[in-house]
Amino acid sequence: MTADKDKDKDKEKDRDRDRDRERDKRDKARESENARPRRSCTLEGGAKNYAESDHSEDEDNDNGATTEESARKSRKKPPKKKSRYERTDTGEITSYITEDDVVYRPGDCVYIESRRPNTPYFICSIQDFKLVHNSQACCRSPAPALCDPPACSLPVASQPPQHLSEAGRGPVGSKRDHLLMNVKWYYRQSEVPDSVYQHLVQDRHNENDSGRELVITDPVIKNRELFISDYVDTYHAAALRGKCNISHFSDIFAAREFKARVDSFFYILGYNPETRRLNSTQGEIRVGPSHQAKLPDLQPFPSPDGDTVTQHEELVWMPGVSDCDLLMYLRAARSMAAFAGMCDGGSTEDGCVAASRDDTTLNALNTLHESSYDAGKALQRLVKKPVPKLIEKCWTEDEVKRFVKGLRQYGKNFFRIRKELLPNKETGELITFYYYWKKTPEAASSRAHRRHRRQAVFRRIKTRTASTPVNTPSRPPSSEFLDLSSASEDDFDSEDSEQELKGYACRHCFTTTSKDWHHGGRENILLCTDCRIHFKKYGELPPIEKPVDPPPFMFKPVKEEDDGLSGKHSMRTRRSRGSMSTLRSGRKKQPASPDGRASPVNEDVRSSGRNSPSAASTSSNDSKAEAVKKSAKKVKEEAASPLKNTKRQREKVASDTEDTDRATSKKTKTQEISRPNSPSEGEGESSDSRSVNDEGSSDPKDIDQDNRSTSPSIPSPQDNESDSDSSAQQQMLQTQPPALQAPSGAASAPSTAPPGTTQLPTPGPTPSATTVPPQGSPATSQPPNQTQSTVAPAAHTLIQQTPTLHPPRLPSPHPPLQPMTAPPSQNSAQPHPQPSLHGQGPPGPHSLQTGPLLQHPGPPQPFGLTPQSSQGQGPLGPSPAAAHPHSTIQLPASQSALQPQQPPREQPLPPAPLAMPHIKPPPTTPIPQLPAPQAHKHPPHLSGPSPFSMNANLPPPPALKPLSSLSTHHPPSAHPPPLQLMPQSQPLPSSPAQPPGLTQSQSLPPPAASHPTTGGLHQVPSQSPFPQHPFVPGGPPPITPPSCPPTSTPPAGPSSSSQPPCSAAVSSGGNVPGAPSCPLPAVQIKEEALDEAEEPESPPPPPRSPSPEPTVVDTPSHASQSARFYKHLDRGYNSCARTDLYFMPLAGSKLAKKREEAIEKAKREAEQKAREEREREKEKEKEREREREREREAERAAQKASSSAHEGRLSDPQLSGPGHMRPSFEPPPTTIAAVPPYIGPDTPALRTLSEYARPHVMSPTNRNHPFYMPLNPTDPLLAYHMPGLYNVDPTIRERELREREIREREIRERELRERMKPGFEVKPPELDPLHPATNPMEHFARHSALTIPPAAGPHPFASFHPGLNPLERERLALAGPQLRPEMSYPDRLAAERIHAERMASLTSDPLARLQMFNVTPHHHQHSHIHSHLHLHQQDPLHQGSAGPVHPLVDPLTAGPHLARFPYPPGTLPNPLLGQPPHEHEMLRHPVFGTPYPRDLPGAIPPPMSAAHQLQAMHAQSAELQRLAMEQQWLHGHPHMHGGHLPSQEDYYSRLKKEGDKQL
């Protein structure tokens, strides 16, 4: 019952008396509290948090809702009831009753407010209550008393707490009293470190032998598991948020009885936050059958039956030997062991090791015992085996492997290992071997459950110091949430202000009705009350049974521009465990407490320590402390570790509660590699993610489990940070040998700039020194035509993160890219401190916030203009260089401008393949704050210092044509840098920093078509449109600003810098809106020949780091039993393990033997290869001799043929000189067919098709000559006939061809039927050449092995004999086959039969024909794509043809069509067609016979149109198909040689390459 407040004096006296009594009891309780082993926090702990923070849950409500609503709430919600507590007459408080009549008693499990909207409630059990007078708190802390929050579960101090005594009228407490409670913590699964929980999951899985499904597979039940702890804290009663039930289960199998009811949890294990270990809860007192041992029935002692006590024991030693004798014996035994060891190992050191081992001593003593303590006998026995067999010798390699596998699988359960894997070993042997094995190097990476080995690292990392800055308000102002949802004030002020609360909608369940609205959950989204309370209680948003469509207004565009200012990032990655893994480090790790745990300085430290997802977001209302910490930080920043800055950079990007006021004091820099002092995103990843790597753990499983946060594959709109805090890469970067370390200082900037200064490049290409010393620092890696002005006031020596560079939020049509915050990839590779290289400097005289420049209403740019690009300047970004993986020297930009002889493989290439948003970036190069549509991630091979400060987020230009010549110099994963061929009206891509390098040999002026309304300079990056050519030394051409006409850039030397014409118009200040704007002409992209590029020579040596000059010493530095380390270079205090030391195995060691064997093996292989090579050379020589013999025969035959009656029709001898033909067997000059330069419009499709239409090696004239043997071309004058041949209307010609085809097919079928009659030889008529009576030349050709005329072949029109119609052919065919006279009759019959069978099978199986010529079906399919236009029209005509149709005679009907048939250079008459071509074949004939257009006499233009080219190409492809099919037949003839000529091999390789190309 409630005590009355009357004013009479009696009650006043009683009240005073009670107060005195209470104070005495409180003092006693405090003394006993201090004597207790468990730690209780003083008032500076949780109580002071709530006393000072003006915090309550409903205050969050006020922040979440609009201002009008909060004012309305505070006006109309007076408290209904008063909170009160009950206590006994001894002063002990037995219960606390809230205004909602919820009764809390000691022992209850309760929720406690966690302060942060994205953190669930803490769960604890109340130990006891105590009342503290506020005056005690006031004397310790200057904090004001607790104010009345507008609508809250009012803390006791805001009301006079009413006491309920058993007498019924307890005195009223003072308004300044606070009711505190001691609580014992339970830890949620998400609050223990990730690796610890993962090991638990793994152990549970391994120990689950029953195959039963574990209860934690249910995600709901999994989230209900807690871990009890013995840690006690003190909290204010106002933090209570409800009661819950917590059940205990003995193991995970018993937990299947748990039912996930409302407010119910369970625990099995305990968690110790000091040691970061889970342990069983067996220390608790448990009663019941499940916790008691079952003892067997009592067995009476056996009756004494005369057995001695030692009857079943084995005596191993009788201490009867004198010490002197024993020592002499042991000395002799060890000497024998030393001798034996020396004999085995080969060195005295091995003998000493063998003698000093414990095994040797034990063996000697055992032998002495077995010899009845006769030293002589024992020594005689020891001579046979002076050294016992080592334990490792008793185990085979396979057994060791199985043992290690068992350790990994079952831990140190040796019974299980023996049972499952090593049944032949005893358990004792396993244990003995384990203790031997655990000391071997192999055990370091295979240790089972290494999580217990990291505690010292954890303790060091997680320790907080009292100087930790706590300057973050408990919750940011509501305006910081504006960009996170469409329910922000900005969105609704203009349109939905009349809707008031109706405009809100829960971002999880999409309800529009709720008691209040808050941002909460892991992603800080707007939630209704039910969803938020569910999240607060259970750590996850409630499941949605009935999905509801979101209201339409929720799809308003999110304001991406606001993303950077508030530092908010709606990170859709896994912050759940990572961000909360620090759990209660805030309240546990304060070193101020006597037992090592610290009471939280305030509640926000605790909550942010538990799971702060921000970089350094802890709050304090103590402004003095904040100022002191700021000044202390400034001092610390003078010496910054690059690795720390990388870490800080990541945290800065990850921060979700920082504002511009805190940015200057955010980043503390310490020299040691330790955790950030403030709980950060890096700390939040997992409590030991960094510690694993600090310790150097090489266990990939540990690293993998410790870095569980995953980076998003494709960035969401606010997802611009790389959440992966993998410090393995940090260490990798840290241990990289510094590629380039040079003293900082720029050409025109003072080299004596203090480390804290930031060097800001001035916008625009202002004149500067023409030579820049090689710099390793990014501050100087800018083009030489940019002066670096230094802004170094003392007040701004600390590193300013982006607040000064954030552009004002403008309604520009394209969201501006946020500036790159700092280059971690460059600095992490340089161990010496370079703080001046980070950050972008304070807002100095060159302020970068030129907002109006961005307000041009032009069309939205696909590349997104950065504000810096408007001024021609930008901070140095961390865009990693697209350096080759094999590149050993990574040059900054200024060096690429200084080293024109740099070889291509060491050229720092621009990051070309930016169009890969699916590739995860290296975790050490986080993508800075840039809006999402442009936030393409870097591909993984982009690592290393960026040679150009290119904006890493530019998508590639839309029309890119890969530069094919670059592909050979790129790693396989890198695409060739694109050559910009896009139209000139493309909006400008912009770059934050002017690309360096002024020695581009290709004069490619950049495309510049700026927005007409843009006043400032738009820099055109050379990376996107014009990548630096690998063969061209130096960088891209200098950038001409859009305000001046572009000039062609001459190739500049190493120290020359071309100056754009308007550069003088650009002021050296930061703002250039007044720069004169010159109209820009359309830019001509002029492709120059690559011959201009000099052959790159060896690069000049890179500038050395500040370490001492190395001196060659070559002294042995360390020796072991089998090897010796030699120190080759001495660098003083610096050293590099890869270059300064080398390793030499000793002569007799195993490694030396292995190396000798490897050398011998390599020698033998080299000799074998040399022998094989010599044999091949001999074979080739013989082959060449045979070829020369054939050539001579062919020439003789050709001379005979040239004297025939066809001489009158031969070509003009003046035109058949070297320009028109090659020697007969001259191989092509290159391994790939030389392609003449394409003259004509740049249309890739036509260009490709025209290459297909080139004349082929196989051209139809002489049948007896193989197609792959180069011959002289046909009549060059044939080019004059081409216009006449192609002037016919194609449709008329096609129709005539089709009719003629049908007629000829009928004739051929009739011929075939006639020939198949009995009495005729089985040989297709098409196999016969012209009868000698028709072709006089043929007579001579048939009597020689090869007919190769030395000059021009017969005139192409000679074949069209007027009388040689199909009937004439039939007459000639009936005259009998014209076989070689030298062939015997059986040879003839066999040749005819084999040929007929082969041709019949080939015509019926097109795939076989293709495979015979090594053409894959894929290639054939590809051919159809190119040839279906004309060639497939005849397909239906020949499907029904019976019998084998010779593939060489009927061009448009036989077989599959091979359109893309590559060929070596040279134009050959076709040696395979002896039959006279038909008329339509003659139309195609010039395509095979004509030279290239460049070979035409005079200046005759090529007369073929594109349509004719296509038609000729298709006809040719059909011809090629049949020629290919004939190839096997040619090889089968006895007069043909079997080996491939060079041109033929060339031809095959080209064919395969073409076949491998993608369609």
Curated annotation (Swiss-Prot):
InterPro entries: Atrophin-like (IPR002951), BAH_dom (IPR001025), BAH_sf (IPR043151), ELM2_dom (IPR000949), Homeodomain-like_sf (IPR009057), SANT/Myb (IPR001005), SANT_dom (IPR017884), Znf_GATA (IPR000679). The interaction with ATN1 is mediated by the coiled domain. There is a cross-link at K559, K636 (Glycyl lysine isopeptide (Lys-Gly) (interchain with G-Cter in SUMO2)). Residues 1148-1205 form a coiled coil. This is Arginine-glutamic acid dipeptide repeats protein. Residues 478-487, 608-622, 736-761, 890-900, 961-971, 1054-1068 have a biased composition (Low complexity). The modification N6-acetyllysine is found at K1150. One of its GO terms (cellular component) is histone deacetylase complex. Interacts with HDAC1 and ATN1. Interaction with ATN1 is improved when the poly-Gln region of ATN1 is extended. Residues 464-473, 708-735, 768-791 have a biased composition (Polar residues). It is found in: Nucleus, PML body. Its main location: nucleus. Residues 805-822, 901-931, 1027-1053, 1098-1109 have a biased composition (Pro residues). Residues 390-442 form the SANT domain.
